[in-house]
Amino acid sequence: MIQTYNESDLHRTLKHLYALEHNGKTEVPVGKWICDIVTENGDVIEIQTANISKLTPKTKSLLDDGRNVTIVYPLVIEKTIETYMPDGALISRRKSPKKQTIYAMLRSLTGIYPLLLHGNLTLEVLFVTITEQRRKTATPVRLANKSRHFPKTWVPQEKKLESIIRKERYKTKADYMALIPPTLPHEFTIPNLQKAIFSKLQEDKTNKNSCTAAANQARLLLWLFTRMDLVEKCGKQGRCTLYRTK
């Protein structure tokens, strides 16, 4: 039977895993905030399974108070979809063709980018496999959060963690600059960056659709990096703007 909580199973599982790993306590009041985890050293760990930028006010406040903050963000590289009838009977189970790459997190950073290079902030990205549970509906429906452009005959119920494949930490300029493939020339255009990202992921045996989706984030990557003072505009090449790393 599917269970529904305000806190997702994925969030809850990661919270308890990190609390055990860091000998921390969960749901701890810190000033006006309730923090997912506070370690025995007073460091804060926040689990964010959706838009990282939603944590901006909380993160800024904690950093201003001198806290070390780690944001843990799961990135789904493999998803199994289970669909259930309203009575809880399982009717289908399949693998989703969609696989996220590291570039999928960029959009969720657009509001928090001023804090990303703060010395006391670490972004820890988990590459995970999950099972997503859905409930069949009698008629097509939209979601309350308005995230659907078109009605569908199912609603999401739960996301369950299956495994953590690996972790990547982003804290320094060098960490973030690793998102720019080393094959790029010193001065480059957005099409150059798109091609380099696509080629790099192909070498890593990423499927074509995921490579294309990642390459399409090149413009957003440069939007972020120019504001983080990692990249600057340096001229024109035809109609294309030239960029270079700083």
Model-derived features: where do they sit?
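Acidic-basic catalytic patches of nuclease active cores, encompassing PD-(D/E)XK
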Residues: 1-34
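Conserved catalytic cores of phosphodiester-cleaving nucleases, focusing on short active-site segments
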Residues: 35-51, 55, 62, 69-71
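Long, low-complexity, charged/polar intrinsically disordered regions in eukaryotic proteins
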Residues: 93-174
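Positively charged, polyanion-binding regions of nucleic-acid-associated proteins
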Residues: 168-187
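Short acidic, hydrophobic short linear motifs in intrinsically disordered regions
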Residues: 184-209
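Short amphipathic alpha-helical interaction segments
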Residues: 209-227
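A short, conserved structural fragment
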Residues: 226-237
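Short, cationic-aromatic polyanion-contact patches
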Residues: 236-246
